[in-house]
């Protein structure tokens, strides 16, 4: 099956549009896992066990692992999800963007080394930097469009030929870059009006939506403005708000409660 088939099946099975970001920070880990040989993996394992029936996908951010030499724990985490949360796909958040020959190696890294089901990429350098990822037709390729960070508008909101750059990106994805039906875009929850405009521009394109939880995005606006006509089409990501919901030995149960609360809040606004 393809990434989007698996993601939609998980969303239906778990009645959930929640994506959990697995972004461990050693300083914030509960004391009960800090002493483990692989503390990031043990932490992630507990989070996955507690939330796998509440989510549509997981999204580890690779920098949290690579920054401290724990790529082996990233790989172990993805393997664990595939084995113990079957049918719940994994987005590797790396935001790659480089010339074609280098992009080929980044695509191999994401899809062959890590066996991720989807990847985030940066379109700034154009289609030839995205093609190596898009050529993996059964994998998801999630393209940065309108991002949640405060200064994203420095470039994304610049107007060219009457449209902001982020709308040009969305149109390229919709009209030219999605030949395999495996593309999506990243649209931040912190810009709900732009989210609404992009949904009108791309009625069926899946959106990965970061920025709820710790970043303060409005869940109601995300759902009302971002869902497709069938009440789907969104992967609403929360990282810190779920994985660091608790600090003690019961951290996994706290993460479950946080994921369930977000799922139920989202569902209360779905059509």
What kind of feature is each model-predicted range?
Residues 189-237, 241:
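A C-terminal functional module that forms or caps the active site or interfaces directly
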Residues 1-14, 48, 127-136, 219-228:
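Short amphipathic alpha-helices and their capping/turn segments at secondary-structure boundaries
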Residues 20, 58, 93, 119, ...:
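Conserved, mostly hydrophobic/aromatic
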Residues 62-112, 191-194:
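N-terminal active-site wall of soluble small-molecule enzyme domains
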Residues 98-186, 204:
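Conserved anion-binding
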Residues 14-18, 53-56, 86-88, 117, ...:
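Short, well-ordered coil/turn segments that N-cap beta-strands
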Residues 1-60, 65-87, 250, 256-271:
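Conserved N-terminal beta1-alpha1 strand-loop-helix module at the mouth
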Residues 21-27, 63-65, 95-99, 124, ...:
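Active-site beta-loop-alpha junctions enriched in small/polar residues
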């Amino acid at each position: 099956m393809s990434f989007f088939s698996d993601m939609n099946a998980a969303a239906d099975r778990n009645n959930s549009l929640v994506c959990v970001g697995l972004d461990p920070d050693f300083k914030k880990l509960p004391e009960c896992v800090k002493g483990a040989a692989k503390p990031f993996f043990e932490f992630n394992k507990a989070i996955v066990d507690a939330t796998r029936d509440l989510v549509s996908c997981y999204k580890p951010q690779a920098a949290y692992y690579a920054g401290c030499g724990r790529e082996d724990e990233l790989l172990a985490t993805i393997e664990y999800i595939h084995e113990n949360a079957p049918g719940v796909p994994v987005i590797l958040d790396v935001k790659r963007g480089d010339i074609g020959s280098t992009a080929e190696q980044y695509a191999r890294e994401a899809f062959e080394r890590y066996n991720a089901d989807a990847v985030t990429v940066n379109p700034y350098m154009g289609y030839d930097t995205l093609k190596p990822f898009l050529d993996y037709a059964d994998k998801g390729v999630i393209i940065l469009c309108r991002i949640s960070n405060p200064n994203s508008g420095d470039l994304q909101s610049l107007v060219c030929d009457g449209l902001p750059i982020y709308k040009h990106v969305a149109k390229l994805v919709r009209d030219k870059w999605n030949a395999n039906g495996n593309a999506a875009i990243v649209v931040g929850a912190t810009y709900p009006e732009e989210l609404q405009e992009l949904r009108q521009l791309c009625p069926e394109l899946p959106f990965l939506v970061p920025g709820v939880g710790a970043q303060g995005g409005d869940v109601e606006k995300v759902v009302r403005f971002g869902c497709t006509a069938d009440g789907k089409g969104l992967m609403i990501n929360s990282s810190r708000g779920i994985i660091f919901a608790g600090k003690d030995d019961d951290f996994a149960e706290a993460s479950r409660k946080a994921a369930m609360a977000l799922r139920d809040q989202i569902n209360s606004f779905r059509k």
